[in-house]
């Protein structure tokens, strides 16, 4: 079973370009780990929205890796995450099961 994990962030007004720089680095890291990753930005609807979608094979592995990542962050990574958090005002996560046909 595969899953699509869609994280959606609403950026502070005018901070989307700055936030996107950080999200591109995060997405590249996921891709380097072999995780299919896409980034989206709004065209219609709510403004200043960035979406990162990951395709994952195991929920257990994903959440285990997330806990390990946050527990072992170096100072540069902490700075990147702090920058992302500083440029966003809210976020949500939606998990989908991918249906193969």
Report each predicted region and the residues it spans.
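Active-site-flanking beta-strand signature of metal-NTP-handling nucleotidyl enzymes
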Residues: 4-9, 51
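Short, surface-exposed ligand-recognition loops at beta-strand->loop->(often short) alpha-helix junctions
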Residues: 10-21
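Non-catalytic surface loops within mature trypsin-like serine protease
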Residues: 11-13, 56-58, 97-100
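An amphipathic, aromatic/His-enriched active-site/gating alpha helix that lines ligand/cofactor pockets
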Residues: 21, 25-39, 55-92
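Short, low-complexity Ser/Thr-rich regulatory SLiMs
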Residues: 41-43
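Short acidic/glycine-enriched loop/turn segments that link adjacent beta-strands
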Residues: 45-48
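Short, low-order "capping/linker" segments at domain edges
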Residues: 89-101
């Amino acid at each position: 079973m595969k899953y699509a994990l869609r994280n959606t962030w609403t950026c502070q007004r005018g901070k989307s370009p700055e936030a996107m720089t950080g999200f591109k680095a995060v997405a590249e890291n996921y891709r380097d780990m072999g995780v299919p990753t896409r980034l989206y930005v709004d065209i219609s609807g709510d403004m200043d929205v960035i979406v990162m979608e990951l395709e994952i094979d195991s929920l257990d592995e994903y959440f285990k890796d997330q806990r390990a990542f946050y527990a072992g962050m170096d100072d540069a990574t902490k700075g990147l995450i702090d920058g992302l958090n500083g440029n966003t005002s809210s976020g949500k996560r939606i998990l989908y099961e991918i249906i193969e046909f």
